[in-house]
A protein has these predicted regions:
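Cystatin/cathelin-like cysteine-protease inhibitor module
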Residues: 1-143
């Protein structure tokens, strides 16, 4: 049920929802605030982001030459910077585990962006305690 709602929420946010391909999804898990992630979850995000950053460094000659970057690289860079800001806020604020606030579901997916380019991402969807309403989403690019 919540996994289905998370997928519907994802589809509603996409430029081309018919192109959506779900790679994997988690079962609903308890959430303790919309900015609290377990150490394992944060470690997993940082590992994925490190791989993406490494790819970007190679493609842009350590970001010294982005003038010739293709649309895919520019889009990936934008998604990576957005995710990095969010992850840094989580880490530096060191949000303590709060009271149980609802549920979270993680979806790994592939889709096509507004430029028609295929991309992959990991999306976290936070629900209220009833598991009916989406409170927040958070996304990082996948390599």
């Amino acid at each position: 049920e919540m996994t289905h709602r998370a997928k519907e929420n994802l589809e509603a946010s996409l430029d081309y929802p018919k192109q959506l391909k779900i790679i994997a999804h988690s079962q609903p898990d308890s959430a303790f605030g919309v900015t609290y992630f377990t150490r394992n979850e944060i470690t997993g995000m940082l590992k994925v982001m490190a791989v993406v950053t490494k790819q970007l460094m190679v493609k842009t000659k350590d970001i010294s030459d982005i003038s010739n970057s293709d649309a895919y690289t520019v889009g990936l860079m934008r998604r990576q910077m957005n995710a990095a800001t969010e992850v840094q806020n989580m880490i530096f604020k060191n949000v303590p585990k709060g009271q149980w606030s609802g549920w979270k579901v993680k979806i790994d997916y592939e889709c096509v962006d507004k430029d028609g380019l295929k991309y992959r991402a990991e999306r976290w969807v936070f629900f209220d305690k009833d598991g009916k309403n989406v409170i927040k989403t958070f996304e990082i690019p996948l390599p």
